[in-house]
Each structure stands twice: as C-alpha cells, then as structure tokens.
Amino acid sequence: YYYYEDANDIWFSFEKGGISISGLSFKIKGEFEKGERIYFIQKGKFLISLFSTISQFKYLLKSLLLGIDYINKKGIIHSDIKPENILIEHKGDSNENNFKITSIKIIDYGSAFNVNNTTAISSNTPEYLCPEITTGNKKFIKELKNNNSRYINCIDIWSLGITILELCLCCPIWMNYKTKIIINGKTYHSTGLFGCRGREANKIYQKQVELCKGINKKLKNSMLYLFDQYDRENFIDLLKKMLELDYKKRISCQDAVNHPFFSD
C-alpha cells in the first residue's frame, strides 16, 4: 500500500495488479517555508527511471494508446483516464540499466459510457477531461453519437495527454496550493496546471486554452531534459497533437501510434 497525508486526513490506498502511476511517481508532503505552508513533491525512482529509459517511456505510452483504442473501438469511452487509474508493475531501475515495465493496466470503469448513450457522460475528474466535455459542447456530443468512429478517441486521448504531461512536469495538475519541485537540480515553485479553487469548469477550460497556446513554454522546466533533442522534439509534437483544443483536429490513437516519436 501507499498513503497520502494532507492537513486533515491520511489516505491509505491498496491496489492489486500493480501500483498507480501517481503512487509510483510522486510523494507529496506539506511543510512550512518562511511562515507559509507549501507542498514539496518528491519524485519516485520509477519516474526518474521512466524518463531516463526512453525505450520504456515509449513502450508505456504506446501501450496505453493501443489499450485506449481497443476500448474505444468496442464503443466504450473510459472518460476518466488519469494517473490514479493506470496501474504499473516494473522491475529494476535506470541506475542499474535494467529498468523494465512488466505490466500495464487501465482500471476504474465507473465513469465509462457507451458511445450510443451519451447521457451517461460524467465529469468526476474535470482536470483530466477534454475541453468539449468540460464546456458541455452539445455539438460534439451529438457528433460523437452520430459519427462515433471519427471522434471516438477524442475524450480519452486528451486525458492520456494530460496524464503524460503531468509526469513531465512532476506536479499533479489538480494541485491548487503552492508547490515546490526540484527538476535537474533546480528548485521551482508553482501550482498544478489546472489547479483552481472549486474546480470550476469555466476556469479549467481557460487554463486548457492557455496550455494549448504555450505547451513548449510549459515544458521548458520538465523531465524532458533527460531526452535527446530528436526524441524531445518528436514527443512534444505528438503531445501537441494529443492536446489539440479543436477535437476535429485532435490526433487519433492509431495515428499517434504511427507518429515518428515511436520510430526507432
């Protein structure tokens, strides 16, 4: 098991089939600095090994794309892809050059819905939802139902993009408190990418718009420093396509799998 402690509670999590990516990647600890309470994020060995071993990073992302595509083609939209709902088993670490992911599972289908029943769409975790669901875009929902093969990946591939971006930035996107992060030996203070009090949809949407206008800037201080220039540029290009604000232009899972980032 692993646990998370905040000002009021201690949360224990027990998981079978692996540990969630969030549990492996971050440990969050509240502390006082100059009289102010901030949260310090400690990176897990898994996260460091993942970005230090490009072949395993590609394997993880490609496997998740294929898994989502498989689910979607069955007419099911997961609609709650996030770090807590991806379980990982692995062995070794980058220091010994034997890091390997052995199992990947997408869990928690409590928010999933059939593409022919769009009335079942929920927004349990709005920070990871795509803009068209965040804003309640009725045109998209109608097109999804009537022409589902074209737009069937739109919801889940956005959520996957945000999940991977969260790992890059080393900070849960929902954090709305001041957070201290250390990347490549440098200390940064920030908040989560979509963190806002009340988790209001319109505020999250505005942050989504800001993100899409400046992904390169957001990734300036990130774990991507561990990638070589070729992989870094190709990955950012793929991520931009996954996080395209216009759902009609957003990349499909199959096209993402065929992106140059995955070519050896």
Per-range role (PLM):
Residues 1-10:
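Short beta-strand micro-motifs within the conserved protein kinase catalytic domain, predominantly
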Residues 134-158, 162-224:
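Conserved C-lobe activation region of Hanks-type protein kinase-like domains
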Residues 72-89:
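Catalytic-loop of the protein kinase fold
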Residues 17-45:
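Structural motif in protein kinase domains
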Residues 89-131, 136:
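Activation segment/activation loop of eukaryotic-type protein kinase catalytic domains
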Residues 60-61:
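Activation segment signature within eukaryotic-like protein kinase domains
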Residues 230-243:
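Conserved C-terminal C-lobe helix
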Residues 244-249, 253-264:
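Terminal C-lobe "cap" of eukaryotic-type protein kinase domains
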